Amino acid sequence: MTANESPPESRIGDDIHVDLAGRMTYGDYLQLNTLLAAKKPLTNKHDEHLFITIHHVQELWLNLMAHELNSAIANIEQDQLPPAFKSMARMTRILEQMITAWNVLSTMTPSDYLEFRSELGQSSGLQSYQYRLVEFRMGAKDAKMLLPHRHDAEVHARLKAALDTPGLYDVSLMLLKRRGFDIPDSVTERDYSVRHVASDAVRDAWLKVYRDSKKYFDLYELAEELVDLEDWFQQWRFRHMKTVERIIGFKRGTGGSSGVGFLKSALDHSFFPELWAVRTEL
């Protein structure tokens, strides 16, 4: 600014609400004081703030993802596919954000993490009940994953309900059956507490959808939304695994798991196996 120039005028105009005493504010609505107070580092190490923030952000996204997943399942059960597609598309965008979060955490070096890792005790992302809830609703059922939550009756009950009820792929296969496709009762009327096992009959049903996508366009779109969702979810898992490897190598996890090996094993299991098998058959 030269000597002859005036300072810029304030961007706060007469219409901006500034008398907020006793009124709902941005901070009130979002309960920011409560949210920000939840970050309580156990050390004075600089990168512990990053570590806590990343995991808080991931948990908030998982909470929204679970909300959208429940909505998608309910809408598919009611043959309301367009709103289900919207929820599924939103979930893929959520996963994009969650993947980006690993890139931020990757700025923490092994030495940075070692400055406070010992303070974590047995706490581990393995114990994230929201992540487990999402996995169960996606179809990755494993009753042993309830064990870390036995100490919390309310959380355990929520997870047990998700374990025992149909997941996203189950309700999608029920929809195929309602539409007249030859889906065996053993697929749609089974013990939902165990993972879906790939079925030739299910693969053939999806193959029929793909080979006549114009006739079955909404089911074709459902299939592609499911594939998108699994693709992004597996990318998130992969980035998680590689971030852990980058920071701790092949050390055991704080929760007692094998660390990278445990995370890598999840990549070998598909949520929707027949939708991937169809691609070879086409």
Task: Give the positions of each predicted feature.
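Surface-exposed peri-terminal alpha-helical interaction modules
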Residues: T2-L282
